[in-house]
Structures are given as C-alpha cells and as structure tokens.
A protein has these predicted regions:
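Short, basic/aromatic beta-hairpin or loop at an interaction surface
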Residues: 1-21
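A structural detector for beta-sheet-dominated domains
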Residues: 5-6, 27, 49, 65-69
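Well-ordered beta-strand positions in beta-sheet-rich domains
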Residues: 23-25, 45
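Short, well-ordered loop/turn sites that connect or cap secondary structure elements
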Residues: 26-32
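Short beta-strand-centered aromatic/proline hotspots
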Residues: 44-53
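Short, solvent-exposed secondary-structure boundary/capping segments
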Residues: 54-67
C-alpha cells in the first residue's frame, strides 16, 4: 500500500512511502512528513486506514489517500 497526503489547495502529493504489507507495523510517528502538517493529527492516522479522511492543517485542509498497489 502506498500512503500519501494530498494538499487540496495545491494538489501536491507528498508520498509517505510503502510500509510493510499493510502499513500496520509502522507507528504514525515514524512517518516522515513534509510540509505544514499537525503532528497530533497522526494520532488518528490508523483509524482511517482504507478510507479517505480530511484533516484541518494550519492554513488549509489536507486529504489522506490510501491506495492499494
């Protein structure tokens, strides 16, 4: 599974890379984030595995996409 954030304002994608077979063996805190993200949002990261979720960033919304290879 490839995990990436999409900035819904600029449409830029930030690839978080593949993590194991399902990603479940990686702590959200281990994910190397780039850009303006709120770390506290990652507490809910694995709660939204497999579906799309919107988080409020410092200046805009960020969309989390999970794509199966």
């Amino acid at each position: 599974m490839i995990v990436y954030f999409q900035d819904v304002v600029t449409k830029n994608l930030i690839d978080l890379g593949p993590y194991g077979k399902s990603g479940m063996d990686v702590s959200p805190m281990d994910i190397p984030l780039k850009g303006d993200f709120i770390k506290d949002d990652l507490d809910r990261f694995w709660e939204v595995m497999g579906r799309e979720h919107y988080w409020t960033g410092p200046t805009h919304h960020i969309t989390l996409h999970l794509k199966q290879l």
